[in-house]
């Protein structure tokens, strides 16, 4: 009887260890936690009215996403990864990539100073101080970047920083495809 009681915790431990090992193997085999699906892919940007970051009172709505393909970059000064990606966004903007910034759950004065100090890659900088547009977009945190086509439809969501590797491998081909489609 004593041996059976000792055997039960051993079996439970081995089962848990097996589940844990399976999940580790699955993650190491290529499941990328930054590739989060978005229910908004294939849908238009949600309706909103937000102020310009630098010009309080100047309002924008979702119509700013129509006309040409662009990136919507969700960022904040409290986000260390946003700081790491910012220089690369400046480079992309210099190359002609159209980027709109969404300052997410931040302080306006800190965000404005950030852009003054580090450069401003954004055509428009939206201020989402309470995070409502971010919530509507399904943002988990910053940075996140959405590729939006000329019709205002979200085509791709990237979680994490934009850097030369993921730009060249994933984002640039999608952006170039959207540019080609917009010219047709």
Curated annotation (Swiss-Prot):
Pfam families reported for this sequence: Redoxin
A GO CC term assigned to this protein in UniProt:
plasma membrane
Q: Which GO-annotated molecular functions does the record name?
A: disulfide oxidoreductase activity
Q: Which residues lie on this side of the membrane: Periplasmic?
A: 26-184
Disulfide connectivity? Answer: 79-82
Which keywords describe this protein according to UniProt?
Cell inner membrane, Cell membrane, Cytochrome c-type biogenesis, Disulfide bond, Membrane, Redox-active center, Transmembrane, Transmembrane helix
Quote the CDD domains the UniProt record gives: TlpA_like_DsbE
Instruction: Indicate the transmembrane segments per the record.
Output: 5-25
Q: Does the keyword RNA-binding apply?
A: no
UniProt topological domain (Cytoplasmic) ranges: 1-4
Q: Which Gene3D superfamilies match?
A: Glutaredoxin (3.40.30.10)
Q: Which PROSITE patterns match?
A: THIOREDOXIN_1 (PS00194), THIOREDOXIN_2 (PS51352)
Q: Which InterPro entries match?
A: Periplasmic_diS_OxRdtase_DsbE, Redoxin, Thioredoxin-like_sf, Thioredoxin_CS, Thioredoxin_domain, Thioredoxin_ResA/DsbE_sf
In this chain the Thioredoxin domain maps to 39-176
Which compartments is it annotated to reside in? Answer: Cell inner membrane
The Gene Ontology biological process annotation of the record reads: cytochrome complex assembly
Q: How does it sit in the membrane?
A: Single-pass membrane protein
Please indicate which superkingdom the organism of origin belongs to. Answer: Bacteria
Query: To which protein family does this belong?
Result: Belongs to the thioredoxin family. DsbE subfamily.
Q: What does the UniProt function comment say about this protein?
A: Involved in disulfide bond formation. Catalyzes a late, reductive step in the assembly of periplasmic c-type cytochromes, probably the reduction of disulfide bonds of the apocytochrome c to allow covalent linkage with the heme. Possible subunit of a heme lyase.
Identification of the protein by name: Thiol:disulfide interchange protein DsbE
Which species is listed as the source? Vibrio cholerae serotype O1 (strain ATCC 39315 / El Tor Inaba N16961)
């Amino acid at each position: 009887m004593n041996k059976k009681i000792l055997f039960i915790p051993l079996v439970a431990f081995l089962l848990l260890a097996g589940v844990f090992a399976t999940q580790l193997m699955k993650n190491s085999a290529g499941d990328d936690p930054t590739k989060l699906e978005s229910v908004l892919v294939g849908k238009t940007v949600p309706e909103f009215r937000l102020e310009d970051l630098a010009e309080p009172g100047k309002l924008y709505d979702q119509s700013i996403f129509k006309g040409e393909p662009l990136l919507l970059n969700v960022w904040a000064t409290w986000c260390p990864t946003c700081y790491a990606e910012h220089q690369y966004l400046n480079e992309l903007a210099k190359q002609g990539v159209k980027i709109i910034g969404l300052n997410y759950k931040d302080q306006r004065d800190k965000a404005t100073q950030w852009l003054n100090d580090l450069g401003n890659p954004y055509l428009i900088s939206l201020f989402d101080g309470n995070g409502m547009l971010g919530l509507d977009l399904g943002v988990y945190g910053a940075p996140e970047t959405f590729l939006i086509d000329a019709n205002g439809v979200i085509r791709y969501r990237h979680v994490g920083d934009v850097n030369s590797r993921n730009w060249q491998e994933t984002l640039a081909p999608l952006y170039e495809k959207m540019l080609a489609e917009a010219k047709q």
